Amino acid sequence: MQHTTIIQLSNVSISQSSGVVISNLSLSVQKGEFVYLLGKTGSGKSSVMKCIYAEVPMQSGSGTVAGYDLHALKRKDIPFLRRKLGIVFQDFQLLGDRSIFENLRFVMKATGWNDENEIKKTIAGVLEKVGLIGKGNKMPHEISGGEQQRVTIARALINQPEIILADEPTGNLDPDTSAEIMKLFQDISKNGTAVLFATHDMLLYNKFPARTLKCENGVVVEV
């Protein structure tokens, strides 16, 4: 089987206001691969994610994400890179005054979708993928935390991304719900979307083993 590299970082250093967070980071992720980014809170996992979606610049090294050269990336092109990425955070960031359907529609309109029939069809499709058929008319406060996280995953899948970046997506969920969400991410990767999954949850990691990068003492190593 031919492998397609979807994320490639070489000798990258990442700085935040506090100074250098990660040094000499080299990693590659293939199309459809599931990879853990494991590390304690504050170890630099989020900085790696932010570098990949071009929120934090590289201080040195080179990087290519979904065909975009991070070093040469112009500000005006960042939204085009991000359309190839789906980003899922620990906090759900749903609009509390809008239904699940309207939350997803809002994102679609913001990223250039105009055909209302296509919008409805696509939303129905992603809600089915994440196991939320029939929940489109519900308000966020009417569904559980696990279901809210499924909505954020549906939101991340809207534009058929090549990569999902999941930053502590199970941090606010109980163990059983976390396991369900993890199975969903694994299904997403099996369908051809790369998943980089940042977590400090060793229980989850031990239950669902996969290729692992560890963030510790300012470096990222494969374990």
What are these regions (language model features)?
Residues 53:
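Helix-to-loop junction immediately C-terminal to a conserved catalytic motif
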Residues 61-69:
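Conserved ABC transporter NBD signature motif
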Residues 70-86, 188-190:
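ABC ATPase NBD coupling module
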Residues 98-106:
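Short coil-to-helix segment of the ABC ATPase nucleotide-binding domain corresponding to the Q-loop/switch region
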Residues 138-141, 159, 191:
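Conserved signature/switch motifs of ABC ATPase nucleotide-binding domains
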Residues 139-143, 147-149:
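Conserved ABC ATPase signature
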Residues 164-167:
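Catalytic Walker B motif of ABC-type/P-loop ATPase nucleotide-binding domains
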